[in-house]
């Protein structure tokens, strides 16, 4: 019997609390969003591009300038410190068809010499395979 009384009391208090919650929710202002009005556009790309080096192909889609930052200052600095990273970047340079002469104006002498060594080693590995 006491269990029934406790359960009834619990349900009654739960209903009272939920009614109070609903009353406080009704006072909340709802602001309209301009994003919903333009649902068909991509929000992050809806701005106009001005000076970026991005080409638009014949389908109207962006094409990134591949290899445009191969010789950025941060990459060159990291290559001087981290030999594993340097080897990965050397492989990228090689994949883009850059010779030692191509990279010379962009890199310090130490990296130019290291790249020449890298290419010689890769050549020997390919010959021996």
Swiss-Prot record:
GO terms for cellular component: extracellular region; host cell cytoplasm; host cell plasma membrane; membrane. Residues 1-16 form the signal peptide. A motif (RxLR-dEER) lies at residues 42-64. Coiled coil: none annotated. It comes from the Eukaryota. Transmembrane segments: none annotated. Its main location: secreted. InterPro entries: RXLR (IPR031825). Keywords: Host cell membrane, Host cytoplasm, Host membrane, Membrane, Secreted, Signal. Pfam families: RXLR (PF16810). Disulfide bonds: none annotated. It is found in: Secreted; Host cytoplasm; Host cell membrane. Belongs to the RxLR effector family. The RxLR-dEER motif acts to carry the protein into the host cell cytoplasm through binding to cell surface phosphatidylinositol-3-phosphate. Effector that suppresses flg22-induced post-translational MAP kinase activation in tomato but not in Arabidopsis. The perception of highly conserved pathogen- or microbe-associated molecular patterns (PAMPs/MAMPs), such as flg22, triggers converging signaling pathways recruiting MAP kinase cascades and inducing transcriptional re-programming, yielding a generic antimicrobial response. This is RxLR effector protein SFI6. It comes from Phytophthora infestans (strain T30-4).
């Amino acid at each position: 019997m006491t269990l029934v009384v406790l359960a009834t009391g619990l349900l009654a208090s739960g209903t009272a609390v939920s009614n109070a919650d609903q009353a406080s929710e009704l006072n909340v202002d709802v602001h309209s969003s301009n994003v919903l009005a333009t649902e068909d556009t991509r929000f992050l790309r809806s701005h106009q591009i001005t000076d970026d080096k991005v080409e638009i192909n014949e389908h109207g889609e962006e094409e990134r300038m591949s290899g445009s930052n191969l010789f950025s200052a941060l990459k060159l600095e990291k290559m001087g410190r981290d030999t594993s990273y340097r080897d990965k970047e050397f492989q990228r340079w090689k994949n883009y068809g850059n010779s030692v002469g191509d990279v010379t104006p962009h890199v310090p002498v130490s990296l130019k010499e290291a790249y020449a060594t890298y290419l010689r080693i890769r050549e020997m590995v390919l010959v021996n395979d």
